[in-house]
Amino acid sequence: MGVQVETISPGDGRTFPKRGQTCVVHYTGMLEDGKKFDSSRDRNKPFKFMLGKQEVIRGWEEGVAQMSVGQRAKLTISPDYAYGATGHPGIIPPHATLVFDVELLKLE
C-alpha cells in the first residue's frame, strides 16, 4: 500500500513542499486500532523535518510531499513505509500499519 492520503481539510492547493525545505507540522500518530502513541499537539510544539533527508519514515516523506500548506490529512501508512518488522520497541509493534493526522502548517 505505501501511503494513502485522505484530506480532512484542504490547504491552499498551490504551495507544496520541495526536497530540502523544512516542513512544519502538527500531528497525532495512532495505531490502526486508534491507540494514540505520539502527538505534537499534546506537546503544543509543532514538529519540523527537512523533506528528502530521511529524517522521518518513508510514509511521511511521500505523504507530506503531496500536501499543500494549510492542509490537514489522514495518512495511512503500511509497515514497509513505517517501522517494518522491527516496529519501535515499547511503542509500535512489529508489522504495524500506522495512521497519522497531519497538518502542514508552513514551510521554511
Swiss-Prot record:
SUPFAM superfamilies: FKBP-like. It catalyses: [protein]-peptidylproline (omega=180) = [protein]-peptidylproline (omega=0). Keywords: Acetylation, Cytoplasm, Isomerase, Membrane, Rotamase, Sarcoplasmic reticulum. Its EC number is 5.2.1.8. GO terms for cellular component: cytoplasm; cytoplasmic side of membrane; cytosol; membrane; ryanodine receptor complex; sarcoplasmic reticulum; sarcoplasmic reticulum membrane; terminal cisterna. GO terms for biological process: 'de novo' protein folding; amyloid fibril formation; heart morphogenesis; heart trabecula formation; negative regulation of activin receptor signaling pathway; negative regulation of transforming growth factor beta receptor signaling pathway; positive regulation of canonical NF-kappaB signal transduction; protein folding. Keeps in an inactive conformation TGFBR1, the TGF-beta type I serine/threonine kinase receptor, preventing TGF-beta receptor activation in absence of ligand. Recruits SMAD7 to ACVR1B which prevents the association of SMAD2 and SMAD3 with the activin receptor complex, thereby blocking the activin signal. May modulate the RYR1 calcium channel activity. PPIases accelerate the folding of proteins. It catalyzes the cis-trans isomerization of proline imidic peptide bonds in oligopeptides. Interacts with TGFBR1; prevents TGFBR1 phosphorylation by TGFBR2 and stabilizes it in the inactive conformation. Interacts with ACVR1B and SMAD7. Identified in a complex composed of RYR1, PDE4D, PKA, FKBP1A and protein phosphatase 1 (PP1). Interacts directly with RYR2 and RYR3. Interacts with GLMN; rapamycin and FK506 abolish the interaction with GLMN in a dose dependent manner. Interacts directly with RYR1. This is Peptidyl-prolyl cis-trans isomerase FKBP1A. It comes from Homo sapiens (Human).
